[in-house]
Amino acid sequence: PAIPAGGEVQVSLKKEYPGVKPWTAETPNLYRVTYSLNGKDSRSVNIGFRTVEIADDGAVLVNGKAVKFKGVNRHESHPDYGRAIPREVMEKDVQIIKAHNINTVRCSHYPNHPYFYDLCDRYGLYVMDEANCEAHGIRNSGMDISRKPSWKKAHVERNMSMVHRSKNHPSIVFWSLGNESGNGPNFVAASEAIRAYDDTRPLHYCEFPHGHKAVDMDSAMYPPVDRVENWGKQKTSRPFFVCEYAHSMGNALGNFKEYMEAFESSPRMVGGAIWDFVDQSLRANPAGNGIYKPAPFKGVTQAYGGMFGDRPNQANFCDNGIILGNRNTTAKTKEVKKVYQYMAFVRKDGSLTVLNKYFHKPLKGYALYLVSLAPGGNHAVERMALPEIAPGKSVTVKLPSAAMQTGSLMVLADARFKLPEDVKELSAKQLEHVADECEAYEWFPATVEKEASVKAPAVLPAVSVRQGDPVVVQGKGFSASFKDGMLSALRYGSQDLILPGCPVALQAYRSPVDNDAWIRGKVEGKMKMQNMKAEYSDVKAAVISPGVARITAQFRTKGSDLSFSGEVAWTVFGNGIINASVRMYPSAKGEELLRLGVTFGIPAAYDQVEYLGLGPWDNYRDRRTSCWKDVFRTSVDDMFFAYSRPQDMGNRMETDWVALSKPKAAPALWVGSASPRAPLEVSVLRYTPKELNNAKSLDRLPEKDKVIVNLDAFQMGLGGSSCGPRPLAKYQTLSEATPLGFVLAPTSALLNLARAGLGVPHSPVIERDGDGMVSLVSSTPGAEMKYSVNKGPEKTYRKPFKLPEGEVRAWAAAGKSGKVPPTSPGERKFPLVKGQGEWKILSASSEEPDTGFAHFAIDGNPDTYWHTSYTNGLPGFPHSIAVDMGTRMKFTGFIYTPRMDKDKGLISQYTFSVSDDGQNWKEVKKGQFTYHYIRKDPAVQRIDFGKPVEARYFKLDARSPVKGGEQSATVAELNIITQ
């Protein structure tokens, strides 16, 4: 028909085309449609055919099949171009996203450049397109524009302009109404407008309450893993999409695997989007070019808020990417690729099961590479062709050798990447490259570890001890000095290996990673762990057997609120082996610690690193899924990672040994765990934790004048969010009696001898839990341990034993070689304790039936809690709860664990009292709890009395709430400090 000027005509065409291939992110089939006006003016557009539906169980179906959306949020940002990203950068972003098994992008928080959607159509990515409705700072306030009628038109128009512009892109499967801008009627109007025009895509908005009819799915930001699991158990037809999770600020992405497992546990948990894809940093060049008060500049840095004199700012809070601003990948990127991968492997009973986790794509033409790991040498490779595996199905194949069935095995699979047929072996570096290229892989540790057996020499070289401070020990080709009982100098041959001023020292502080926000205030502010230093006493040195000397010292730390005491023992052999045993007892149990171990410095020239442990990138107890155990070769500079704000990095879990050398030289120093069954956590960097923490940007780091070696018994997990939940409980590290053993040697042969032939029997630490069960723990697992109770007969330790009160003495039996006496016995006296299981609630001002019983406060489970009444009246503050311990107990403080799932009912002002009859009370402590990080994750409160008290009953009076106006109080756990 004729179209008048300014007019509009809508034309509908219908035609059947047989054999059309549908579009999915896995199979991005596109068709080119060209339309013209009178054959003169023409346009072309790519289209894809696909459907999006919601199933009765809450699953989202693409073309009739349930899909998990493995997503990431993406801002348009580049350090050189700012928000105006060139097309080639957009394409590189999409290539990186696809290469790391991400199938979904949330356009946060505005529609992106049109070309980006073309790329998503072509490469295959699901997209949540989001309207530019962002009023973060004024939502849910008197200025909330989502509730102002004058802003209704803006909300509707911004949403509809997004829909009209991008409606023909098959990649867009969700419309999002905006971000964190309130949940008023203007968003309901926007929802109604979209639905009237396009009802083919589900609607999302994170601010509406769950179940709200204006959107088709529930949503949340930064929930803890257990909450995701609980949402998945709800019986509803509404999908749940976690629009922001795994906040990737700095050294982050802990417990990422557990989030994916939670998504896969329920049909309605359709997935989520990591926050976020790329650091929003800016490139800053030499000093004076915009950087605010810079230190002497030595190169290019990633600038963030505040470095340009801008006030206010959010510092590095926009540097949350799994890749850096310059598009370099990180250990976070590797973890995402591994956890999001579309194949799963299970080794069992000599067979390998391969599961296809794609939703639409069959595994066709895939090759399987089976790599038997032989750390330190080349790894044998065998190929196997996989039969075609349909989506969601699996096949099981027989592993061809006994070594593959029980040994350390790497399984890799891909259809595009092919190893040449003549390649029968891979070096560690080649395996790293293949794993990076392959679509999916899995490492299976050996099911049975073969312990090396090295015969001890019949005669050890002589060793001499020169008394004084320092004590000097000399043997064949080496000398070692011990100042104040700690190794302060070491010379192997002609090489001095301990840097003057950097002796071996105890360490319980790491430069906080961004995700340590939940505990940083406590660690640095209250506990002052960065100031911890040890004082040594009772230093003893002697030759204890032919060719063996021992130096021992008692220590107690000062400068920090949490202190440690214990013993260090150095066993020095005439051949240069030095075996260290450290027993550390904290002044308080159960305090969160970022790390615990030792540190020392070596000359800067020894910057080449070889190690047997998890790698090839850095890993932590909750971010290690993408790693495998091998001998890796790297450098100190390569173990450093250029986060925009320097912080802890470079950690390697399960490290058996690390060797340090100058470039193109043999290793001069070998450092290993004391036992193959007690690997260490190790990092080797140019900087101390304090230096990393003090440098707020890369250009402010000091000169590279040393190498710092950190040997840890443990490090805290990274956690999954700097603005949300702390690390999972299983990845947290708490103060407790801790043994640490390690070995230094000049050669690998002597290191192996030290660990397998000349093992020093390390006497155990002695620990007792709240129920009175005593455990003995040695830094040499498997060692035979002896003990006596109250000076009674000697017993062999086999399992924890009950001790309500008394003295325990524990020691190690003689080692296998018979050449080395055990380290000195440990002794501990324990006051009377009755476990929480024997306690009873004496009284409570009120309780909430079923969900908030008073006895939940002493049940040992922090996931349950006493909640004052709210369904049968709301009494308001003050509240009280009293406990009967069943007998008189001597204690020095109490522990209040707040409710952990949310910041509700938190107690501010309190009074703690004790009684011998349960009626007459004596006030012991009065004060106010301090919360360093309230949002979503209150901190455990540990209150010391200053001097011991003795009583049978105790009572906590809650006098005021943290949040003004709250009426209820909650207590997850109440306990006492007995030592």
Regions found by a protein language model. Name each.
Residues Y17-R32, M404-M410:
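Short glycine/proline/serine/threonine-rich loop/turn segments at secondary-structure transition edges
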Residues T24, P400-T406, T447-A756:
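Beta-strand/loop-rich accessory regions of lumenal/periplasmic or secreted enzymes
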Residues T27-P28, L363-L368, E591-L596, D903-T911:
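Short coil-to-beta strand junction motifs in C2/discoidin
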Residues D41-S351, K357-K364, A374-N378:
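Extended substrate-binding grooves/exosites of carbohydrate-active enzymes
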Residues F263-L487, N579-A580, Y731, T747-N752, ...:
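Carbohydrate-binding surfaces of carbohydrate-active enzymes
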Residues T329, Y340, R556-L562, G719, ...:
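Extracellular beta-rich ligand/substrate-recognition surface
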Residues G757-T864, H879:
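Short, compositionally stereotyped local motifs that mark structural "simplifiers"
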Residues N861-K926, D937-Q979:
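Aromatic, loop-rich ligand-recognition surfaces of beta-strand-rich domains
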